[in-house]
Design a protein with these regions (language model features):
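Conserved metal-phosphate-binding beta-hairpin within the catalytic cores
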Residues: 103, 202-223
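Anionic ligand-binding catalytic core segments
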Residues: 117-120, 126-175, 219, 223-284
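Intrinsically disordered, low-complexity acidic/polar segments
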Residues: 33, 112-113, 214, 228-230
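A long amphipathic alpha-helix within ATP-dependent nucleotide-binding catalytic cores
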Residues: 171-203
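Coil-to-beta-strand transition motifs
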Residues: 21, 96-98, 198-202, 214-217
Length: 289
């Protein structure tokens, strides 16, 4: 069996070169506030991979995605080990676009903090009188730049996203920026409507896109996972305060409340976090992992 080494390690994912494709492995690492924590969260990588597959399958009518297979028999022998079972995806190679495409359907998190101070989120004027966790009249698109590990992503305006893309793709900045915005909002609307029918509010999420060898836009990375999104239970939803969630909010809240934490979570917070990931997956897909 040929040993394979990742060509790229992100906060949570490892990418392996497989010739004309890539193998993307979602590890059980967890990151908060752009820092990789010292804990491993068992089954988290499997939730991320299988949930991405679920959404990729659902949205092919809007935009193609980079997934080739999550079936272990389709990928090299090296990945046919227990630690890769369920958390590995064979993907098409893409030229990734240097923008994180964030869409917000509800006002929460950094968006709420910004709105309280300025009445705006990422430069977008919002109606007066919104309460924390309110649904926005329409989803808003708030792009950011992609940071290297250890740096923070930087929110930018739509106009700045055009200029940023133009640096990498001369003559295509405006066209690509518009496609990123329009696809982001279309994907969010379809998936948020479906999730609500299953009892989950998708408050906000982040997509990443790339270009295939023919220059066509394709969804890359992960899609609508608890790592890239805020999922709230629809039951008991009440604006005016923060909402319980099916993501790593338990971890974020504990870290904020315990600033001298050395980036290590207590085991009960780890257990609650994976419990929420699994519950969200089961509600959305109707399947157990």
């Amino acid at each position: 069996m040929q040993e394979m080494k990742p060509i790229k390690e992100g906060k949570v994912r490892e990418i392996y070169d497989n010739g004309d494709s890539l193998i993307m492995v979602a590890t059980d690492r967890i990151s908060c506030f752009d820092v990789i924590l010292n804990n491993q969260v068992t089954k988290k990588g499997t939730v991320l991979t299988q949930m991405s597959k679920f959404w990729f399958d659902m949205t092919e009518d809007i935009l193609p995605n980079h997934m080739i297979s999550v079936d272990v028999k389709d990928i090299p022998e090296f990945f046919q080990q227990e630690k890769f079972d369920g958390n590995s995806m064979m993907c098409r190679k893409l030229e990734m676009l240097p923008i994180e495409c964030i869409v917000r359907g509800y006002i929460t998190g950094s968006g709420w903090e910004s709105y309280k101070k300025t009445g705006k989120v990422c430069g977008i004027e919002l109606p007066e009188g919104l309460k924390e966790s309110d649904k926005l009249p329409e989803p808003i698109y708030t792009p950011s730049t992609k940071a290297e590990i250890g740096d923070h992503d930087e929110n930018i305006s739509y106009e700045q996203s055009i200029a940023h893309l133009e640096k990498y793709f001369p003559g295509r900045g405006e066209e690509l920026a518009a496609k990123l915005r329009d696809n982001t909002i279309a994907l969010y609307k379809k998936c948020a409507e479906y999730a609500l029918s299953k009892g989950i509010i998708i408050a906000d999420t982040k997509f990443e896109f790339g270009l295939d060898k023919d220059g066509n836009m394709v969804i890359g990375d992960e899609m609508l996972t608890p790592d890239s999104s805020r999922f709230w239970p629809a039951e008991g939803y009440e604006p005016g305060h923060g909402q319980p969630s099916f993501d790593k909010q338990f971890a974020r809240d504990w870290l904020k409340a315990n600033p001298d934490n050395d980036w290590t979570l207590p085991q009960d917070i780890v257990d609650k976090t994976i419990g929420k990931y699994l519950q969200g997956y089961e509600m959305l897909t109707g399947k157990k992992l």
